[in-house]
Amino acid sequence: MSTTVRPDEVSAILRKHLAGFESEADVYDVGTVLQVGDGIARIYGLSKVAAGELLEFPDNVMGMALNLEEDNVGAVMFGKSTAVKEGDTVKRTGILASIPVGEAMLGRVINPLGEPIDGKGPIETSIRLPLERKAPGVIFRKSVNQPLQTGLKAIDAMIPIGRGQRELIIGDRQTGKTAVAIDTIINQKGKDVFCIYVAIGQKGSTIAQVVSTLEKYGAMEYTTVIASSASDPAPMQFIAPYAGAAIGEFFRDTGRHALVIYDDLSKQAVAYRQLSLLLRRPPGREAYPGDVFYLHSRLLERAAKITDDLETAKKMNDLPEPLKPMVKAGGSLTALPVIETQAGDVSAYIPTNVISITDGQIFLEPNLFNAGQRPAINVGISVSRVGGSAQIKAMKKITGTLRLDLAQFRELEAFSKFGSDLDKATKAQLDRGARLVEILKQDQYVPMAVEKQVAIIFAGTQGVLDQLDLQYIRRFEEEFLSLLEHKHSDILNSIAETGQMDVDVAKRLKEVAEQFMSTFKQKVTA
């Protein structure tokens, strides 16, 4: 018996089947690898790719488009380029390089892409900010007016740093540049300053040592470490500082204070030179590309003190969408870039560039370091162009003549080596200078509260220590500060709370110092 199928039944069955059919297709813009080597890939296609856009290579290797040429795209790879070969397909991601930010990043060690490398599990944060971002415009900034205490007497007294400033730490290798930076981080404990330490092109063992030091002194609670070691590809070392700036900007734009340390930008410039030469960009002075100044200026301009007016702050240029509801006024981002010089040559290309971008420099000298002066700061050529307006009044008052006294001491010291017959005034000046130099010496990882710095420097500039042997200065300092802390804490509290030292406080402090000196001299000479 034959069955007849009615046409309306057929159409109903077809309609039923077609109802569940999805015609959507995933569309990718893809290209083909023409050439690969040394962490660089030349790609055919990707005609609509943006400069700085992330690309996806096979085996989950990420890359970034840097050269947009007529017939190909030059890209750098963040992973192992050995996994990529000629003819491989490359996908556009449609997103620019970004990094996760937020409080969850504190206490963690990450790579420049924001991936944790400390074995403490994934980072729980939903906010991502772009690595590259325009610096705040002039209208959104405020002049530096709050101090950022480093805890180092030589810096806080003569080369003061303010919140929102860019202060360069420059010197030869092994002169204590990283030590100054780490001491500054340790000194921010309890001061509501979030710190970001960016290690660029350093040995893995050195980075591990820095992390363990920060943990030992309880500084990792408010610090993020971005590690791009010497074994990482050059593109990772190139983007590391921008990752640090992005994390710092989150705190800056949400009304808080952040400190970012780039250790060091010389190695970032070398990594960028390597990339540029491999991408066949024309070389300039010292084989660096023509835009190496812009490499550092666009990074360091992101450090700023933001205006206190909330309505103005909310209109800040280039504000990413995730940040807009969280914006608060009055935040700051302070940058301490580090530059390594070769044989003290500050007139080389990268050092002169960064000196001209920053608001001052702390110059560390091997001769001073080897002579036992730590930190080995050359006060003569170190300067802070804007920090003076942020320095507390008490410190400004007592250090007015300190820089001049030390400069004259250095000059007289050089001349005194030629002859032994010195007049009384010259000898007194030499003695005072030697004691001031001794006062400014400080052990590593022992930052000092600003009120204690004021007390001991005041004792030195008032001539209280002039008759004391140099070998006893450090001991006097320890015992004198201990006495103030336990028996005259009101003096220290007054300086700490008001930031000033009025006539009465100065008079009392001098009396206490002189009384203690007389008993101390009896004790050491007995």
From Swiss-Prot:
CDD domains referenced in this protein's UniProt entry, alphabetically: ATP-synt_F1_alpha_C, ATP-synt_F1_alpha_N, F1-ATPase_alpha_CD
SUPFAM superfamilies according to UniProt: C-terminal domain of alpha and beta subunits of F1 ATP synthase, N-terminal domain of alpha and beta subunits of F1 ATP synthase, P-loop containing nucleoside triphosphate hydrolases
Catalytic activity: ATP + H2O + 4 H(+)(in) = ADP + phosphate + 5 H(+)(out)
Binding site for ATP: 171-178
Keyword Nucleotide-binding carried by entry: yes
GO MF, one annotated term: proton-transporting ATP synthase activity, rotational mechanism
Topology term for the membrane: Peripheral membrane protein
UniProt subcellular location: Cell inner membrane
One GO CC annotation: proton-transporting ATP synthase complex
Key words, A-Z: ATP synthesis, ATP-binding, Cell inner membrane, Cell membrane, CF(1), Hydrogen ion transport, Ion transport, Membrane, Nucleotide-binding, Translocase, Transport
Database matches in Gene3D superfamilies: 2.40.30.20, ATP synthase alpha/beta chain, C-terminal domain, P-loop containing nucleotide triphosphate hydrolases
Keyword match Cell membrane: yes
Sequence similarity: Belongs to the ATPase alpha/beta chains family.
Subunit note: F-type ATPases have 2 components, CF(1) - the catalytic core - and CF(0) - the membrane proton channel. CF(1) has five subunits: alpha(3), beta(3), gamma(1), delta(1), epsilon(1). CF(0) has four main subunits: a, b, b' and c.
Function in brief: Produces ATP from ADP in the presence of a proton gradient across the membrane. The alpha chain is a regulatory subunit.
Protein name listed in UniProt: ATP synthase subunit alpha
